[in-house]
Regions:
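Rossmann-like NAD(P) dinucleotide-binding subdomain of oxidoreductase/dehydrogenase enzymes
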Residues: 1-113, 242
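Alpha-helical segments flanking ligand/cofactor-binding loops in enzyme cores
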Residues: 8, 59, 80, 84, ...
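A generic structural signal for well-ordered alpha-helical segments
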Residues: 10, 86, 150, 188, ...
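Structural detector of well-ordered beta-strand residues that form the stable sheet scaffold
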Residues: 11, 18, 48, 94, ...
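ALDH superfamily catalytic-core signature
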Residues: 38, 45, 69, 77-222, ...
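Short glycine-enriched loop/turn motifs at secondary-structure junctions
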Residues: 44, 64, 97-99, 130-131, ...
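CheY-like receiver
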Residues: 60-61, 117, 251, 274
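Conserved C-terminal structural/oligomerization subdomain of aldehyde/semialdehyde dehydrogenase
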Residues: 67, 104, 158, 208-330
Length: 330
C-alpha cells in the first residue's frame, strides 16, 4: 500500500502519526487499522487513522501548527494546494504526486518482450496509478507493427471484477471517474487525436452497473494536447511517433511531470544514454514498475518533493541538531 511507504519511515524515526484515508477504500482502511491495533510493538496512539470522503480532517492537519510534517500521495494539483496552505507554518512536505510516464520504444526493441509489459503498464489498476504508462513514444521504423499488435491486445482485453481470475483489468474507483476519463477522451478526439482503439464506459450487460472502462489508444501529432500533458488516471494511452533519438527524448521530457519512464532497446549504450537524459526519478530499461523498497523513489518537477523508500525516506521525519561543547569552560 502507498500509505505504508510514508508510515514506515515515520514510525522508524520515532514520530507519532495521523493517517487520513479516503472514504472510497473503507474496507481496506478498516483492515489496516485492525492490523495496526493488533501489533504488539506499537504503543497505543502511535498510529491514528481516520477516513473521510471530503477534506475537512485533512485541512485540520495541514492548518495545525503542532503537525510539523505532511507526507502526501495524490495529484499534483492537490499537492500544490496543501503546500500553499501549510506554508505559513513552514511545514515540511513529502509529496508523491502525479505522473505521465513515457515509454520510448526504439526500432531495435524486442516487441515480443515489450508488448505484454506495455499492455500491463496501462491496465494494472485500470490506469489508476501514478506510474501508469500513459505515453507511448515509438520510433517510426517499428511504429506500424507496434500499433497493430498493441491495438489487438487491447481490443481483446477482458474487463471484469478484480476478484474474477478471468479478468485482465478491473474497474475505476467510481462512476464519477468513469465520466471524467470519458470526458477527457472525447475532448482529445475533438482536438484532433486519432482513434486506434476506442474503449470507453461499459454500458451493457452485468458490468454496466459498475465503474468499468475499456482501454483506449489514441494516436496524436500535437504533443501539447491535454490528453498528452495532463494525468488521465485511467486506461487511456497516447501514441506518438518519433524519427530519431533526440526527438524521442525531447518528447519524453515535454511534460511538467517527471516521475518515471521506460526505455526499450537492445542497445545498452543507448539505453543508459537516454535514461540519463530523461528528467524522471525512475527509469526502467526494457521493463516497467520494478520498484524496490530499499531504493529511493520519487519524482522531478510537478511529480513531487522528497523520496519514499530507501534511507532517504527518513529525511522527511527527522531533524538534524548541532550541539557544540567547549571543554574546560565550566
Amino acid at each position: 500500500m502507498l500509505m505504508i511507504r510514508s508510515l514506515a519511515p515515520a514510525l522508524a524515526a520515532g514520530t507519532t502519526t495521523v493517517v487520513k484515508m479516503p472514504g472510497q477504500t473503507a474496507q481496506t482502511n478498516a483492515m489496516v487499522a485492525r492490523i495496526i491495533a493488533e501489533a504488539p510493538s506499537l504503543p497505543a496512539g502511535a498510529v491514528n487513522i481516520f477516513s473521510e470522503s471530503g477534506s475537512e480532517g485533512a485541512r485540520r492537519l495541514i492548518d495545525a501548527a503542532e503537525v510539523p510534517v505532511i507526507s502526501f500521495t495524490g495529484s499534483s494539483a492537490t499537492g500544490r494546494a496543501i503546500s500553499a496552505a501549510g506554508a505559513r507554518h513552514l511545514k515540511r512536505f513529502g509529496l508523491e504526486l502525479g505522473g505521465k510516464t513515457p515509454h520510448l520504444v526504439f526500432d531495435d526493441a524486442d516487441l515480443d518482450a515489450a508488448l505484454p509489459v506495455l499492455e500491463k503498464s496501462l491496465t494494472v489498476f485500470a490506469g489508476q496509478f501514478c506510474m501508469t504508462g500513459s505515453r507511448l513514444l515509438v520510433q517510426r521504423g517499428v511504429a506500424e507493427r507496434l500499433r497493430e499488435r498493441l491495438a489487438q491486445r487491447l481490443e481483446n482485453l477482458r474487463v471484469g471484477p478484480a476478484a474474477d481470475p478471468r479478468s485482465d483489468m478491473g474497474p475505476l474507483i467510481d462512476k464519477a471517474n468513469v465520466e471524467r476519463v470519458e470526458r477527457a477522451v472525447r475532448q482529445a478526439i475533438a482536438a484532433g487525436a486519432r482513434v486506434v482503439v476506442r474503449g470507453g464506459p461499459v454500458t451493457e450487460g452485468e458490468l454496466a452497473a459498475g465503474a468499468f472502462y475499456r482501454p483506449t489508444l489514441l494516436e496524436v501529432d500535437d504533443p501539447d494536447l491535454d490528453i498528452v500533458q495532463q494525468e488521465t488516471f485511467g486506461p487511456v494511452l497516447t501514441l506518438q511517433v518519433f524519427e530519431h533519438e533526440e526527438e524521442g527524448v525531447a518528447l519524453a521530457n515535454r511534460s511538467e511531470y517527471g516521475l518515471a519512464a521506460g526505455v526499450w532497446t537492445r542497445d545498452v549504450a543507448r539505453a543508459f544514454r537516454v535514461a540519463r537524459k530523461i528528467r524522471a526519478g525512475t527509469v526502467w530499461i526494457n521493463d516497467w514498475a520494478k520498484v524496490y523498497d530499499e531504493f529511493e523513489e520519487g519524482g522531478y518537477r510537478q511529480s513531487g518533493l522528497g523520496r519514499l523508500n530507501g534511507v532517504a525516506a527518513l529525511d522527511d521525519f527527522v531533524e538534524y541538531k548541532h550541539i557544540s561543547l567547549t571543554t574546560g569552560a565550566a
